[in-house]
Amino acid sequence: LQSIDQRELVKATGAGFEQVRTTETITKDVARAYYRAQVERRPIVLNMPADFMWQEVEHVATVLDVFTAPGGVAEGNALDDAIGMIASARRPLILAGAGAVSAKDSLIKLADRLEAPLATTLKAKGLFNDHPYNMDIFGTLSTPAAYDIIAKSDCIVCFGSALHSFTTDQGKLMRNKRVIQVDIEPSAIGGSLHPDAALLADASLTAETILWWLNEAEIAPSGFTKELDSETLTVHPIGTNKTATGCINYVQSLEVLESAFPKDRILVTDGGRFMTEVWCRISAPDPQSFIVTANFGAIGQGLQESIGAAIADPDRPVVMFTGDGGFMMGGINEFNTAVRLGLNLTVIVANDSAYGAEHIQFLDRKMDPSLTTFDWPSFAEVATSLGGVGIQVTTIEELEAALVSLDGVKVPSLVELKLDPNDVPRMRI
């Protein structure tokens, strides 16, 4: 069994690999794995031979000190060039990615000094929620108002973002603008888009350095935010309801769910056609409370990661959105695990009775989509039979009533949205 090169398999995923060598070195090997995870800032797989499992060893607590130092400070001609571009910009914009989450306060100070709006990549969703000029997600998931602002901007200062094709909309959003990229990881700079200036440095320290020089040179604020209507920056239009009878409108459902769930929550999304509307319309309080499970483009990972999130933070509700295909693949067999653990978990199944990503492709090619459709069992009934509470809804009124009835429920719950496969919005990617 498992007679493959496990080290090479793990390395191919981007994770690190640490081998437990002998029973005598177990505590050191485990400590080494924890050390590497902190220093390398990536998952480390600890590989232990099965025949070690029942051997008795003397436990000796081993902790390796992690030597940390502030990240690099920007300097030299590259810094001068970047500051010159920022100082001369009429409509600057600050973009933060997952690599700049810890720099939140410094980025806000810089944005306020420049009078520049703030935006995030998908993985940094929620970072600037409370700021009046928060544009939310930058890229193909932007609101119409945010798209207009991006179009008007002349300088985009990017912190902790690799600027991949979804963020830049295949590069179109960055055309005719000066792009400054700040990242501590060399591989993140210029990988997808070549910037006009690049600073291999810590995001927070760089923002503070730029701010200091702007003040030192008495550079006037841009005034860009004075042109903006802060009320519209994060508003996505609802659109026309074309949903067939017997089904619930998906976008309207999300608007109801956004208002109904506690704001201090953990948001998890599985993969599928449904997910991009969730990313746009369902908020998370901060990036650490937002879990995207489709990193490999694979569906069926959502419930497993939701269980982990609920165990890690039992004092907050976890809300997980999944499609019907993803729930059948990896959710239905784990729902009872959530029940047995008594987790504070609500699962929303966007059930369009189809593999939605394929359904739209068949329609686009004027082919019969019936091959992509399925007559699933009732997910609500299955959830109830597994020890939870399941409710299927086909109207907004039924959804609102279901949410009221679930208030105070002490077991995992599931709300099945019965959707029209012909009226689920296209993925915004």
Predicted regions and their residues:
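Active-site diphosphate/adenylate-binding microenvironment
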Residues: 229-315
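N-terminal alpha/beta PP-like core and its mobile active-site loop of ThDP/TPP-dependent enzymes
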Residues: 1-217, 256, 263, 344-347, ...
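Glycine/aspartate-rich loop-and-adjacent alpha/beta segment that forms the canonical ThDP
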Residues: 8, 52-75, 282, 381, ...
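Thiamine diphosphate
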Residues: 94, 146, 152-155, 160-164, ...
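Short glycine-rich anion-binding loops that position phosphate/pyrophosphate groups of nucleotides
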Residues: 50-51, 98-100, 124, 161-164, ...
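Acidic, Ser/Thr-rich peripheral helices and adjacent loops at domain boundaries
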Residues: 360-377
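A general structural motif
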Residues: 68-81, 100, 139-142, 247-249, ...
